[in-house]
Amino acid sequence: MNDRADGGEQSRRYGIREGAFQAIMLGGGENYLSAFALLLHASAFQIGLLSALPQLIGTWTQLLSVKALSWVRHRKSIILTGVAGQAFVWLPLLALPLIFPEQGPWLLIACAVAYVAMGHFAIPAWNSLLTDLVDPNRRGAYFGHRARVMTVSSFAALCAAGLILHSAEAWEQPWMGFAVIFLAASAARGVSAAYLARIDESSVPVTREDEFRLLAFLRREHGLNFRRFLLFSGLMHTCVLIAGPYFVVYMLRDLHFSYLEYSLWLAAGVIGQFVTLKPWGRLGDRYGNKKVVAATALLVPFLPMLYVLSANLHFLLAVNFLGGVIWAGLALGLQNYVFDAVRPEDRAKGVAIWNSVNAVGWFVGAMLGSVLAGVLPGEIAFAGLEVRPASNLP
């Protein structure tokens, strides 16, 4: 019994370390995919597609992963397949667009689809395994701590990658900077896979997934609440992603920010998450994740409005810091609500369905944003009054 408890504690530590190296990949690699697309002269439509299509297709692999959970004995085999595949995909993602620059943006989108799909393939099994390892009463604190560690790692990687890109830009060889940060992202995901391989799956009882029947799952106890939650989360992602993918276009192409200034803007959001993740986790444990979600969701609509007011770098840093604070609570609350709202044997299915709904909203919002960016006028005129917002795309 003590051996099992010790194994569980060690596995929880490995889960945090794995998250740290995963965050290095996200902060130092994935955060700069859109910037790489702009280097390849991607259009606004291609930027939107780069953001939305991988998420949409990735959810299909997540549903396949849920089905695979009933076929395999060990959840780690599914997790490691996805994570190792994700580490490998960084290599063609970097090389192919540089070898065939005429088709660079489309090749990048194709590789990004494979990259996200591999990551999504691991998510249901990972959530099922890690939540089994953590006591339900400590789940908010544990995942809050893990998210905090990931935020620090992501911030460090984001800043380091920004400095590397800035140096490469100064030498007029920006592609070399992207080569360095993407290869580092691949290596970090490889280390993440190594820590995942060391998690002792035998230290906790295996939660067997029931057969996946979508309608039956949604009709079960708490089904109505979960359907409302799915509708809310999907619509939230739709609205947010109307503008979300195009901030990089606005910053780098229209405001002519350097890679360093763009990195500072990204870093401000990460700092906002870092300083508030632990308090959000405690608030979720004390008052419930639903209240955390409700409080933060009410503030999200005001964030994009602030970008209309000024194009000053310091102002935009403050806005993104505030965005990091709000999104830290919303993201953590949404994740933990799913864990709490469904039965343990339905957890992987619940996560997969939730991510699928989010991805549909993500795709619809990003595509709608690409259309609006092309058809909306540059200034607003009404009753002889003309207004040109500071954030207008030319």
Regions found by a protein language model. Name each.
Residues 93-112, 306-320:
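Helix-loop junctions at membrane interfaces in 12-TM secondary transporters
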Residues 60-74, 165, 275-288, 373:
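Helix-to-loop junctions at the C-terminal end of transmembrane segments
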Residues 34-39, 67-71, 94-100, 154-176, ...:
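Transmembrane alpha-helix termini and helix-breaking/packing motifs in multi-pass membrane transporters
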